[in-house]
Amino acid sequence: MTEVFTIKQCLDGEISIDETVTVRGWVKTRRDSKAGLSFISLHDGSCFSPIQIVATDQLSNYHKEVTKLTAGCSMVATGKLVASQGKGQFFEIQAESIEVVGWVENPDTYPIQAKRHTLEFLREVAHLRPRTNTISAVTRVRHSLAQAIHRFYHEQGFFWVHTPIITASDCEGAGEMFRVSTLDLLNIPKNDKGQIDFSKDFFGRETFLTVSGQLNVEAYCMAMSKVYTFGPTFRAENSNTSRHLAEFWMIEPEIAFANLEDICKLSQSMLRYLCKTVLEERADDMDFFNQFVAPGCIERMEHIADSEFEMMTYTDAIKALEASDQKFEFPVSWGLDLQSEHERYLAEVLCKKPVIVTNYPQEIKGFYMRLNDDGKTVAAMDVLAPGIGEIIGGSQREERLEILDRRMDECNLNKEHYQWYRDLRRYGTVPHAGFGLGFERLISYVTGVSNVRDVIPFPRTPGHADY
């Protein structure tokens, strides 16, 4: 039996010329010549480029099946791998047999025709869009970045912690959470006050889908020293923008005996490592993005990989913005959060490279961030990148129980719900720090695909959960 190879193996020169191979995949296009030949472009997802299958009318099923192949049909081809005579390809397969595995019903209505489709249209056929050049390339880049993240942290001595999806804690304190319940919606139990009685629910209390794994991973940080979580998070935020998803993935490292400077260094090392990796491992996909989606994206990745990030405090950033001649849509004032236009000005115009802004006013940051000695700012950091703005947000955590309690009171958080988190400050507390990186935002930045709905397999957004 002939060995089955991927198209990537065939095109990468791993197989000797004139060796008989079997490949499997889906038809992208087929064209016929008057000389009794069919040229089939076949892809299997293993790399960006398809491989050409040359079929002659000597095949037993040539007229009955081969000439009826259309885009989307699945097939198995066996034949000799030879040097290609055509332009733009080094190898092709001279078919000795073709087996049609699956036909496309009604080819005229098949959604993924051999033409360029808008990303908006492809969201309507999310189950078929991985068959397109753009989405398959995004998927391979997503894979390489995910693998690189795990590899980076493993090499740095971190342990991957699987934090829970279902939680009773709101890390962000914003309240935009999806409730998890098995209560009968037609017969909801009530307590003496007429409120929903969550003690009758599955977990015996009110529970939600997690908005972040940070609080949980902090617990493991207090025993394992260097940990990270990489998993799905959920926000019930009714935002229909190119930057928001209701379900997305987060990378959240946490380091014990660490301060703000430590995570600033870690974030820079990680981003530089990821940019180098994707350029090395996904060169063909990045060439596609650079040519057809976001010209200059390769140069941008090279720039980040080679740059020393700029550092500035929030206060200095505000001064620089106020001193600039740029007209901003949103006001600039100490105490207000930086908007995307401010972030991009700092990274693209002022610094012309990634910049890490530190020490933000406590009022605009999370309750868990460490209060600085000035009593006004917290030891927070945001990494701002040219072309996108904020890509990483983090902080040194508040390890002093009395100050953490005060911040929770100021944020109107119920301390009873955070008893276990407060315990971490009671039993062997240490300075510790971490950050969060939205995975989809990273992929969007790397590929230049501007809408995060197009870099996750099945996007979850307000009004959309069809698959």
UniProtKB/Swiss-Prot annotation:
The gene is asnS. It comes from the Bacteria. This is Asparagine--tRNA ligase. Homodimer. GO terms for cellular component: cytoplasm. Keywords: Aminoacyl-tRNA synthetase, ATP-binding, Cytoplasm, Ligase, Nucleotide-binding, Protein biosynthesis. It is an enzyme of class 6 (ligase). It catalyses: tRNA(Asn) + L-asparagine + ATP = L-asparaginyl-tRNA(Asn) + AMP + diphosphate + H(+). GO terms for molecular function: asparagine-tRNA ligase activity; ATP binding; nucleic acid binding. GO terms for biological process: asparaginyl-tRNA aminoacylation. Signal peptide: none annotated. The lineage of its organism: Bacteria, Pseudomonadati, Pseudomonadota, Gammaproteobacteria, Legionellales. It holds the Pfam family tRNA-synt_2. Belongs to the class-II aminoacyl-tRNA synthetase family. Its EC number is 6.1.1.22. It is found in: Cytoplasm.
